[in-house]
């Protein structure tokens, strides 16, 4: 009995390590491809233009963003991609760059970018909100202006209804190095999804060890 228990423990440990290492490799690859996307000049230009479009007044800027956020949420509540504000952000140059990335890396089921204030610039999907700066992932990636890579635990994404991992990375001005916006994606772990769902069961998220993090 002791030998059997010992063998089972060793096999389970090996399986856990293998799964963790495999997941670590997938996440490293994902971060590398997203980092390349953050260097896309056309994408950055769209973000810079939106940042420059605001009045030089923080209160007025927030009022403008809040107004658009209400319009956006109304459109989302009625599943309306034809709303002019939504349609603009699904079809502009930033969105087209994100769609191209998504075609190459289809496990990214939702990709979008915000400006420095957390307002959407372009997106592949109609998100639940226009304003994103109040989200944990946004604040973590912004990191008080220093920037950081954010990786969530596996969770059910409210916009897509699928189990995935959220990644968020800062977008920087090439000339100054300053953060100008945030890139976020929901990444579906297709090769591991069945195993993850079995572990999560009826809950919506789980803790996960990521090697090197």
Regions found by a protein language model. Give the residues of each.
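Short hydrophobic alpha-helical segments used for membrane anchoring or interfacial signaling
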Residues: 39, 110-117, 206-213
